[in-house]
Amino acid sequence: MAVATTEELYQRLLRSIREGVDLQPKMVNVGTVIQVGDGVARISGLEQAMASELLEFPPKAGRSEPVYGIALNLEKDSVSAIILGDYLGIEEGDQVNSTGRVISVPVGQALIGRVVNALGQPIDGKGPIQTTTYRPIERIAPGVITRKSVDTPVQTGIIAIDSMIPIGRGQRELIIGDRQTGKTAVAIDTIINQKGQGMVCIYVAIGQKRAQVAQIINILEKYGALDYTIVVAATASESAALQYIAPYAGCAMGEEVMENGVMIDGREVRDALIVYDDLSKHATAYRQVSLLLRRPPGREAYPGDVFYLHSRLLERAARLNEDYGGGSLTALPIIETQANDVSAYIPTNVISITDGQIYLETDLFNAGIRPALNVGISVSRVGGAAQTRAMRSVSDRLKIDMAQFRDLAAFAQFASDLDATTRAQIERGQRLQEVLKQPQFQPMPLEEQVVILFAGINGYLDDVPINQIGRFKAELFTYMRTAHPEVGKMIYDNRLDRKFPSPEIRSAIENMLKEFKQMSDFSAEQA
């Protein structure tokens, strides 16, 4: 290789000065890798490193791009870091540079409609993300003074949830259940229902199969939900380190929406909904990272700070008061249980952190009751504060009635004869159960939920055969949309007075029921 002459070096220096290259010397703390394996590197010489500082493994022969890591263990004579990316090219003796900053991800308008990895890098083939706005993934949660009580509903479009376990903007509501009980389906339906509601959605996939993530992205595209959604994917094939930071990266993107807003359909939006799917796999990834870092294991081999792992994440969900912009970040964490055991370590941790839980049960799912909601142990600690006046008035008794119906139905299996009151209660419960059934990807508007619940609770469906409830629902909704659109608008705008229900709703249901009986040719005796 030819050696550059003094003249050539001088010319290069002049050219650099003309082009404005910064020739000022920079002081960089440099360390050396003394041990590496399984995505963890021990580094000597970085005595000045901060906790959670971003470290750079610079390019070398065989690696054109730098690899980054996060310093997690600060020991007496070394630093242990998890490596974000391909660690196979890192060897003993490699140089490591301190960056003096914590890991940040791109945020803001440019991410809407994109699929990114845990570092905020695009993985959807739509080109680079054009943004100059970055946020650190870790941040202290908003303080008490900056918050406002939760009082605005997040309409999930799922009648069983909106009526009995209402979710408010700024709430943390856990979705918990065994595998294959419809947890992700509830979250995806909620995202689909936010179309036109002024909400940005963030879906964080942690440790899932790539095929499953691709299927979810296709569903969001099909229903037009990707236009206001960000997907953050750290799949099962990626390192435990990336799965560990993925929810924090998604949360940083949501906080940008909450605090500074983005434009959706020509208007500013400051409300965000984030789904963590799921935090069981997140805890497993953190356990793997901690064991590789030689941290002492505790219960079920999880490290001692596994509670703080999730509490510092979920506490960042908030409703800000008007002085701080009035935005909100609503969190829907998902936890997978084993054999319906909600008293295991991670489930109890997350239940105690969140503001309620939606418990989905395998037996109900297999019985065809979908969503498979167990009313008895599902709860929202925000309650009626996050409901409109009309929904609150029809759903006050619903949860108690449904819980009592489940108990009576279980008792009735062993009883030979039942008194008339108990039989009537069971029959009404069966009809309400049919009302609460809902197919996937078919969110129900608020006004339709209120009307059908009012009909069910007040006995208008008592004479309708159970197998005709679905048909009656569809025809009632069509009738209300065509004959009484003003009632639906009043419910949606929350303009009904305290004398709910309005006479129009009663007369509409009675007229529809009369027509339905004539068309269907059934009587109370046939029911």
Curated annotation (Swiss-Prot):
It is an enzyme of class 7 (translocase). Its main location: membrane. GO terms for molecular function: ADP binding; ATP binding; proton-transporting ATP synthase activity, rotational mechanism. One of its GO terms (cellular component) is proton-transporting ATP synthase complex. Keywords: ATP synthesis, ATP-binding, Cell membrane, CF(1), Hydrogen ion transport, Ion transport, Membrane, Nucleotide-binding, Translocase, Transport. CDD domains: ATP-synt_F1_alpha_C, ATP-synt_F1_alpha_N, F1-ATPase_alpha_CD. The record marks 378 as: Required for activity. It holds the Pfam family ATP-synt_ab. It is found in: Cell membrane. Its EC number is 7.1.2.2. It is a peripheral membrane protein. The keyword Disulfide bond does not apply. It catalyses: ATP + H2O + 4 H(+)(in) = ADP + phosphate + 5 H(+)(out). ATP binds at residues 177-184. SUPFAM superfamilies: C-terminal domain of alpha and beta subunits of F1 ATP synthase, N-terminal domain of alpha and beta subunits of F1 ATP synthase, P-loop containing nucleoside triphosphate hydrolases. Produces ATP from ADP in the presence of a proton gradient across the membrane. The alpha chain is a regulatory subunit. PANTHER family: ATP SYNTHASE SUBUNIT ALPHA, MITOCHONDRIAL (PTHR48082:SF2). Belongs to the ATPase alpha/beta chains family. F-type ATPases have 2 components, CF(1) - the catalytic core - and CF(0) - the membrane proton channel. CF(1) has five subunits: alpha(3), beta(3), gamma(1), delta(1), epsilon(1). CF(0) has four main subunits: a(1), b(1), b'(1) and c(9-12). This is ATP synthase subunit alpha. It comes from Roseiflexus sp. (strain RS-1).
